[in-house]
Amino acid sequence: MANILQRLPIGEKVGIAFSGGLDTSAALHWMRAKGAVPYAYTANLGQPDESDYEEIPRKAMAYGAEKARLVECRSQLVAEGLAALQCGAFHVSTAGQTYFNTTPLGRAVTGTMLVAAMREDDVNIWGDGSTFKGNDIERFYRYGLLTNPNLRVYKPWLDQQFIDELGGRTEMAEYLIASGFEYKMSVEKAYSTDSNILGATHEAKDLEFLNKGMHIVHPIMGVAFWRDEVKIEKETVTIRFEEGYPVSINGREFGSALELFTEANVIGGRHGLGMSDQIENRIIEAKSRGIYEAPGLALLFIAYERLVTGIHNEDTIEQYRINGKKLGRLLYQGRWLDPQSLMLRESAQRWVAKAVTGEVTVELRRGNDYSIMDTSSANLTYKPERLTMEKGQEYFSPLDRIGQLTMRNLDIIDTRDKLSIYVSAGLLRGSSTTGVPQLPSGSDE
């Protein structure tokens, strides 16, 4: 059956994810004026650019909502963020700078918790501000239907009547003023911003042009570390993990993961840690560009990965990274709760994260410039005495190594024979100088 409504359902309850901004304010009032019964739901995700959450439901009621609710989502969002960290569920990176999937994590929490709140009010139609070109329209669709199998979706931005009447920001502002509301359009930024406690995303408008860099962005979770006038003092931070979870910062324990994460954001933000510029593939395979902030996740991830590499063996680390990239892409696609994701999550959280106990000390400087100063854990398999160049207890002898190297002769002989086959087939050319077959250079073809 079709779950997407192309026209406003007159006389029916319609839930809307309400931010209090121009778009959702105009949409809510328009739906009420056209005969629908709008219910407004606002997620408290710890958005750093939101000063008064309690005011948002009051705005919704003023614009015509039948009911307006503020849904507390911060603790759940932090829990999902830490799960992603434990799994390394981050697939977008450029030259070692990571995007921490903060928006996809926010959508997983919003899409499930708001729809669950709607069900409590017997609201089975919902809408939000996502456009047909982006990722969120699919993420919300998936999470919404997973939470409520009877859900129908109405999005004003897919309704041609709404588009014809209120197709732009100017038209929406004029509509609210004509309806008797005082509304003053804010100064248009050169880009759009979406944020939650895990991180911020800046994209669109001027940032669609690759000759516009990070420097046009005004960070909302940290400092503009690239500006010479911004003074940043280096800082040493010690983070402790127990069984994969961060439990203290600089020896201070917190009453909840939310409190700890809030402190990690403050510390990382002082340095502009975790900002990155990424080109990525959207779900529909078209490329987009974003500038990202995630100071707390970046700080915790440095410490977590340091412990992972010191505790686990190479094959485990390799599998953790491969699975993390797979899981990161699934998360990005709105599949965080799908069976294949749960399988990958359970594997990493049980067999990788559970062993991650210890402390890491990091010196933070400007931006993503940092040094790891100390690492300690009872679970470390890094033991310098095993490979020390100084005299001491021998874990293996020269004769042991001779035997090990002799066994390598078997695959070396096989490799040499294969190279000869490739020379005969014309895939490689023989070398009179090195004796080792070489790939042909471009000039040889």
UniProtKB/Swiss-Prot annotation:
EC number(s) from the headed UniProt entry: 6.3.4.5
Arranged from A to Z, the UniProt key words for this protein are: Amino-acid biosynthesis, Arginine biosynthesis, ATP-binding, Cytoplasm, Ligase, Nucleotide-binding
What compartments host this protein?
Cytoplasm
Xref: Pfam families: Arginosuc_syn_C, Arginosuc_synth
PROSITE patterns named among the record's database cross-references:
ARGININOSUCCIN_SYN_1, ARGININOSUCCIN_SYN_2
Q: List the disulfide bonds.
A: none
Q: In which pathway does it act?
A: Amino-acid biosynthesis; L-arginine biosynthesis; L-arginine from L-ornithine and carbamoyl phosphate: step 2/3
Q: Which reaction does it catalyse?
A: L-citrulline + L-aspartate + ATP = 2-(N(omega)-L-arginino)succinate + AMP + diphosphate + H(+)
Positions of ATP binding: A17, F18, S19, G20, G21, L22, D23, T24, S25, A43, G129, T131, D136, D194
Q: Name one GO cellular component term.
A: cytoplasm
Please give one Gene Ontology molecular function term for this protein: ATP binding
Chief location bin: cytoplasm
Q: Where does L-aspartate bind?
A: T131, N135, D136
Alphabetically, which GO biological process terms does the record hold? argininosuccinate metabolic process; L-arginine biosynthetic process; urea cycle
Q: Where, by residue number, does L-citrulline bind?
A: Y99, N135, R139, S192, T201, E203, E280
HAMAP family from the xrefs?
A: Arg_succ_synth_type2
* Complexes and interactors: Homotetramer.
Q: Which family does it belong to?
A: Belongs to the argininosuccinate synthase family. Type 2 subfamily.
Name of the protein in its database record: Argininosuccinate synthase
Q: Which organism is this protein's natural source?
A: Gemmatimonas aurantiaca (strain DSM 14586 / JCM 11422 / NBRC 100505 / T-27)
